[in-house]
Regions:
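Well-ordered alpha/beta subsegment
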Residues: 93-97
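Gly/Ser/Thr-rich loops at beta-strand to alpha-helix junctions
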Residues: 44-46, 101-105
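Divalent-metal-activated hydrolytic enzyme cores
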Residues: 1-35, 70-79, 87-92, 105-186
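A short, structured active-site edge motif that brings together acidic residues
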Residues: 63-71
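Short Gly/aromatic-enriched secondary-structure transition segments
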Residues: 52-57
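Short beta-strand segments
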Residues: 40-42, 66, 98-100, 170-173
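N-terminal low-complexity or amphipathic/hydrophobic leaders
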Residues: 30-46
Length: 186
């Protein structure tokens, strides 16, 4: 059985007996984050089903935006676009950027990604097309805590983010679940 077949089979069993606390939710209200909070965090697999209980959040409480290294790469990158929807359409009033110790992005470089892409058959022309952006993204990430400071600063100074939105920065330990306050938004 392939992975996608396994996922679909699991989903069929799940849907045959869904949790009752999910099926009775109001469709409109369930899209709005109850805590009026958006979280920008990493896509690391160790955070799945671990970060949420460590924060005391559950389904319907917050909007969670994940990417490699919880990076903000531009004034209108996909993370900022998601935050704009969170703020202007869904009522978010606070943002927390959560980095984590032992983040793989600290060891990722544009060179390592370029070599891997070329070895998997991506053309040199395609890599050259994105090389500037790739360098700026992958080579800028040096240390997870510095990246949290950087991401918070980019959100706070973004001309599209209202000044009344509080932006905080936390570090999370993927083995202990411990949170550390890095930046307290005012």
């Amino acid at each position: 059985m392939t992975l996608i077949e396994e996922i679909l089979q699991t989903n069929e069993k799940f849907c045959a007996n869904p949790p009752t606390d999910y099926s009775g939710e109001d469709v409109h209200d369930s899209k709005l984050p109850k805590k009026k909070l958006a979280i920008v965090t990493c896509m690391d697999t160790r955070l799945v089903n671990f970060l949420e209980p460590a924060l005391g959040i559950s389904r319907g409480d917050v909007k969670v935006i994940k990417n490699a290294g919880n990076c903000i790469t531009g004034v209108f990158d996909s993370t900022i676009r998601s935050l704009l929807v969170c703020i202007y359409e869904l009522g978010v009033q606070e943002i927390i950027v959560i980095g984590h110790h032992e983040c793989g992005m600290a060891k990722t470089t544009s060179e390592s990604l370029t070599k891997a892409m070329l070895s998997r058959g991506i053309s040199a022309d395609a890599v050259r097309m994105i090389q500037k952006d790739l360098n700026e993204w992958a080579d800028e990430f040096k240390h997870p805590e510095e990246n949290v400071h950087d991401a918070v600063a980019k959100i706070k100074t973004n001309p599209l983010i209202p000044k009344d939105v509080k932006v905080h920065g936390l570090m999370f330990h993927p083995r202990s679940g411990k949170l550390e306050l890095i930046v307290k938004g005012e």
